[in-house]
Amino acid sequence: MAANGLQNAKPNPMVGAVIVHNGRIIGEGYHVRCGQAHAEVNAFASVAKADEHLLSESTIYVSLEPCSHYGKTPPCADLIIAKGVRRVVVGTIDPFAKVKGRGIDKLRDAGIDVTVGVLEKECQWLNRRFFVYNLKHRPYIMLKWCQTENGFLDDGFKPCRLSSPFTTMLVHKLRAETDAI
């Protein structure tokens, strides 16, 4: 679900949230666009009026630690506390310096049971550009080249096309996901 925000969430990370009560999904959302509501806000907004009373008995699953600071939107950790959810499952800690464990601490300080690290590698891979930028203070670098079967860039005799329609499409997809070329 978080991957739905691929084109529009950046420079923010892609985040998904699912609210579950006794094995039934009662709310879900993702971070659609930078500067707009985060995944948790959208998940709570999707809960039917008839199910709102179930929130105190529900678990919210989030792919990235809920934010704990004011930016363009209020802190999601505060919203989770206000909604009365008693259990939060977090995919991975947010590497952004203004969050970096503070959202988890805020939830735990409010008496909420928090589990961290569920599908952690997958959640980090989804936001690898965000993680590299925040942890290594540099852009995520991706290399692309095309070569012949014997390791050359062309056959040396005549112009040739080395890529297939599929790889051309794949390259355009990767370029669309990249901030710079």
Predicted segment positions?
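Local cysteine-cluster metal-coordination motifs and their immediate loop/turn environment
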Residues: Y30, A37-H38, I60-L79
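A short, polar/charged loop-to-alpha-helix boundary motif
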Residues: R33-A45, S163-V171
